[in-house]
Amino acid sequence: MRILVANDDGYLAPGLAALVEACRGLGELDVVAPEQNSSGTSNALTLQRPLSVWTAANGYRYLNGTPSDCVHVALTGLLPQRPDLVVSGINNGANMGDDTLYSGTVAAAMEGYLFGIPSIAFSLSEKGWTHLDTAARVARRLIEQVIALPPVPGAWLLNVNIPDRPYEDLRGLRTTRLGRRHASEPVIRQSNPRGEPIYWIGAAGDAREAGAGTDFHAVAQGHVSVTPLQVDLTDHTCLPAWGSWLERAGEGGR
């Protein structure tokens, strides 16, 4: 068993060290992570400049790119062997609902999935690493289970969110669907030293769809949320309606 460990908070983040330790003894480990915090970079790849890779004193490799860059470079030339599993995290804060579209943590795992490798993204529900030990224990337990009993044939992608509470207070694992958030808060406008306007992206919106069965609901109730993800963004339920509309629009536009 060979495991690739990545993240989006950077190679110095406590969450990465905790996930690496959670994987100790489960196989050969390779760690490839961003040089700097790259939260919110989604699935971006760096195409406008070359990437450099360095090795830290603890053996972690890090590069001046995005989380997706890290996994992509690892899988397409950096590593001597293809990993059997890709794990990403442990993120400093939740990646639930719409967060998954922006998350570098999820993106790193998704990059592994795109290459046909089972992959898991781990996130602690609140910022600050208060119960990082809880998240690490959950990660260890889940990784052990998927190694011992693969859930489905072939590649798969899981998004795991762990409540920020003592391990003894967890209420178990739940399979969930993604919830939804309200739109983000307005941008924060400030001025630079020249008096020119600058903008900071506003905070994420509150949960909008957080009913039973969603990741938001599970975590709020003290459950570890386990959400299977896929890459296909097609709205299959709307395909017939759009097909009919295009036929009508085409006839009307002649």
Curated annotation (Swiss-Prot):
Its EC number is 3.1.3.5. The keyword Protein biosynthesis does not apply. Binds 1 divalent metal cation per subunit. One of its GO terms (cellular component) is cytoplasm. One of its GO terms (molecular function) is 5'-nucleotidase activity. It is an enzyme of class 3 (hydrolase). It is found in: Cytoplasm. Its cofactor is a divalent metal cation. It catalyses: a ribonucleoside 5'-phosphate + H2O = a ribonucleoside + phosphate. The keyword Metal-binding applies. InterPro entries: SurE, SurE-like_Pase/nucleotidase, SurE-like_sf. A divalent metal cation binds at residues 8-9, 39, 91. Signal peptide: none annotated. Keywords: Cytoplasm, Hydrolase, Metal-binding, Nucleotide-binding. Belongs to the SurE nucleotidase family. NCBIfam families: PRK00346.1-3, PRK00346.1-4, surE. Nucleotidase that shows phosphatase activity on nucleoside 5'-monophosphates. This is 5'-nucleotidase SurE.
